[in-house]
C-alpha cells in the first residue's frame, strides 16, 4: 500500500522556455502570496507535509494571524508519504519581470475554454508536475484532469464529444512529454468516468466519458470513452 494526499491548488507555466520565464513561473507557483487566487495553496499545504516546514513567505505575511506552530505540530504534520496527488485542470502563463520577479500574462479574447469557462492550457500538465517533483522529490499522480461540456445524445444515439477528445489528447501529450523526460509521473486519472454531481455545480456540468441519463440512470459510453479505451489499450501510443 502506498499513501499520499491530493490538496487543491493552482498552477503556472512559463511563457517560453527561457530560463528567466521558467524561474518566474516556478517562483509564482510557490512563493506568490499577493494574487487573489489559489496559487499560494500549492506551497502552503504541501511544504509542511513534504518538507516539514511552512514556507517563510507565508509565515512572514501571516504572522499576525497565525497560532503558535510547535515542533510537535510539525512532527505530526510531516509524515512520510509515498507520492504527491494533484487535481490539475489549467494553469496561468507567467513571464519574467525585472520589477516584480514575475508577471501574469493576460489571456487574449477568445482564449480556448471549457463548458465551465475554465481556460484550456495543456502545457500545465508538463510544467506543474516538473515543478512539484523538483521541489518535493516525490512521484506525482494526476488525480483529476478533464473537461466539462454540455453533452447530449445525438440522433444517431451517440454522444459526439470531440471537444473532450481534443482536450484529453492535448493534455496527455504534455503528460507524456514529462514522462519522456523522466519526470516521475506515476499515474493519470481522467475526470471523470461518469457524469456526476459536481460539488460546486450540481448536475449542471458533465465531465464524464460515460453519459448518464439522470432520470433513468441509463449509461451510454461517449465517443471520448471509446477513444480513451484505445489510449489505454495502446499505452498512450495513439496520443498525438
Task: List where the protein language model places each region.
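Active-site region of glycoside hydrolase catalytic domains
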Residues: 1-240
Amino acid at each position: 500500500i502506498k499513501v499520499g494526499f491530493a490538496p487543491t491548488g493552482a498552477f503556472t507555466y512559463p511563457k517560453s522556455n527561457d530560463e528567466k520565464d521558467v524561474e518566474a513561473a516556478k517562483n509564482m507557483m510557490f512563493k506568490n502570496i499577493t494574487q487573489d487566487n489559489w496559487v499560494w495553496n500549492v506551497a502552503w499545504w504541501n511544504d509542511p507535509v513534504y518538507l516539514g516546514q511552512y514556507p517563510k513567505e507565508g509565515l512572514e505575511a501571516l504572522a499576525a494571524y497565525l497560532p503558535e506552530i510547535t515542533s510537535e505540530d510539525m512532527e505530526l504534520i510531516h509524515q512520510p508519504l509515498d507520492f504527491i496527488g494533484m487535481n490539475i485542470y489549467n494553469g496561468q502563463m507567467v513571464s519574467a519581470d525585472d520589477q516584480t520577479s514575475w508577471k501574469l500574462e493576460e489571456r487574449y479574447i477568445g482564449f480556448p475554454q471549457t463548458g465551465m469557462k475554465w481556460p484550456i492550457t495543456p502545457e500545465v500538465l508538463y510544467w506543474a508536475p516538473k515543478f512539484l517533483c523538483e521541489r518535493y522529490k516525490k512521484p506525482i499522480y494526476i488525480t483529476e484532469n478533464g473537461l466539462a461540456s454540455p453533452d447530449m445524445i445525438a440522433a444517431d444515439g451517440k454522444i459526439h464529444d470531440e471537444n473532450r477528445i481534443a482536450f484529453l489528447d492535448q493534455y496527455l501529450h504534455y503528460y507524456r512529454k514529462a514522462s519522456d523526460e523522466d519526470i516521475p509521473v506515476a499515474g493519470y486519472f481522467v475526470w471523470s468516468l461518469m457524469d456526476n454531481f459536481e460539488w460546486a455545480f450540481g448536475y449542471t456540468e458533465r465531465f464524464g466519458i460515460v453519459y448518464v441519463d439522470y432520470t433513468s440512470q441509463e449509461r451510454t459510453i461517449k465517443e471520448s470513452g471509446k477513444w480513451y479505451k484505445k489510449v489505454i489499450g495502446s499505452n498512450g501510443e495513439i496520443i498525438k
